[in-house]
Each structure stands twice: as C-alpha cells, then as structure tokens.
Amino acid sequence: MANNLGLVILLLVIVLVSCSKSSDCALASPQKSRPSSEWRRKLIPVRSSRSPRSPSFAPKKPPPPPPSPPLSPSSPPSN
C-alpha cells in the first residue's frame, strides 16, 4: 500500500514538473494569463470610512448618563 502511494506521488510530481515547463500541457489552464493591469481594473475601489483624518476615527465618547428622576417621597402602602 505504501509502495503504491509513493509511486502515485512520484508520478504526480513528474507530471506537475513537466507541465510547468511546457506551455501546451493538457492540465494547464486554456485561458491566457491576463496582464496585471487588466485584473486590477476589474477590482472595485473601496473607500475606508475609518481613515485617520475623519472624525469617525476618533474614539467615541460614551453618552451622558440620563438625568435621574426627582425622588418622590415614598408613601406607605395602603392595604
């Protein structure tokens, strides 16, 4: 079993090495590689909303505590 596994791995390595050196390999992708500027044009530009210059980058202050309601004198419970 280990012998067969070693042969399979060796065969895969040979195929990959020979494929990487030849340009018309059956395992190679049929598409031509695109120039780097072409795929960069397809990227969507994303603007960061948290840049150091924007005010949203500063740490947010915690909201002020709500004003406490006036204390009303507690009336004794009536039964």
Curated annotation (Swiss-Prot):
- Where is the motif named SxS motif essential for MIK2 binding mapped on this chain? 49-51
A molecular-function term among this protein's GO annotations: receptor serine/threonine kinase binding
Tell me which GO cellular component terms the UniProt record holds. Answer: apoplast; plasma membrane
Q: What does the record note about the induction of this protein?
A: Accumulates upon infection by generalist herbivores such as Spodoptera littoralis.
Localization per record: Cell membrane; Secreted, Extracellular space, Apoplast
- Report the residue ranges where the short sequence motif SCOOP motif is annotated in this entry: 45-57
GO BP term, example: response to insect
Q: Which UniProt keywords apply?
A: Apoplast, Cell membrane, Cleavage on pair of basic residues, Membrane, Secreted, Signal
- Where is the segment annotated Disordered? 25-79
Q: Where is the composition biased (Pro residues)?
A: 60-79
**What residue spans carry the Low complexity bias annotation?**
45-59
Signal sequence region: 1-19
Protein family (similarity comment): Belongs to the serine rich endogenous peptide (SCOOP) phytocytokine family.
- Report the function annotation for this chain: Brassicaceae-specific phytocytokine (plant endogenous peptide released into the apoplast) perceived by MIK2 in a BAK1/SERK3 and SERK4 coreceptors-dependent manner, that modulates various physiological and antimicrobial processes including growth prevention and reactive oxygen species (ROS) response regulation.
Oligomeric form and interacting partners:
Interacts with MIK2 (via extracellular leucine-rich repeat domain); this interaction triggers the formation of complex between MIK2 and the BAK1/SERK3 and SERK4 coreceptors, and subsequent BAK1 activation by phosphorylation.
Q: What is this protein called?
A: Serine rich endogenous peptide 2
Q: Which organism is it from?
A: Arabidopsis thaliana
